[in-house]
Amino acid sequence: MNGIRDVVREEQPRERLLLEGAGSLSNRELLAVLLRTGSKEETVLKLSDKILHQFDGLRMLKDATLEELISIHGIGISKASQLMAAFELGRRMVRLEYQNRYSIRSPEDCAKYMMEEMRFLQQEHFVCLYLNTKNQVIHRQTIFIGSLNTSIVHPREVFKEAFRRAAASIICLHNHPSGDPTPSREDIAVTKRLVECGQIIGIEVLDHIIIGDHKFVSLKEKGHI
């Protein structure tokens, strides 16, 4: 009887959540709670397994489109919408933790502030953090999306927002979708150009952080600033 009870318990993730807390559930079980029901052909846990397999786990699932989700047999508009809403809430909660005038004292602080948001992006995003005199983030702006080079990253776009926000300094960041944050020659060239412009204008570019997968490189620490 105990064996049967254990099997039933494993097949009831919502009940496990209520008894043991959400932290005790696996990824497939949490997904099953969001989906609520399976299909005529398979249980909700089997459907969860299929989704995780399709997207190679959570890494790619978080950026799944509506079309990609409903292409999976057993997932309709309703289930796909529930999943996408849950993923977006998760992203917003991560941002909330750091939104209230987050202070940056080191490259590690900066990487921590943006890592979870940027490390899974499938295209390069060039982002600027605008700081006040206390090194607190007063604004964040995505300057452009695409491969980084000196012809695309124009200082005018970077510093225009700094003037609008009365920023004292800027930290630039961009991600490498490959997961490897090693700076390229273009990364270094863009950084030096922005630093030079900042010196002329009087708004210091403090650092340029390259985000990889759970790792980062500070161009200031590498001696390029």
Curated annotation (Swiss-Prot):
Gene3D superfamilies: Cytidine Deaminase, domain 2 (3.40.140.10). Pfam families: RadC, UPF0758_N. The keyword Iron does not apply. InterPro entries: MPN (IPR037518), RadC_JAB (IPR025657), RuvA_2-like (IPR010994), UPF0758 (IPR001405), UPF0758_CS (IPR020891), UPF0758_N (IPR046778). It comes from the Bacteria. Zn(2+) binds at H174, H176, D187. Keywords: Hydrolase, Metal-binding, Metalloprotease, Protease, Zinc. The keyword tRNA processing does not apply. A motif (JAMM motif) lies at residues 174-187. GO terms for biological process: proteolysis. One of its GO terms (molecular function) is metal ion binding. Residues 103-225 form the MPN domain. Belongs to the UPF0758 family. This is UPF0758 protein BCB4264_A4572.
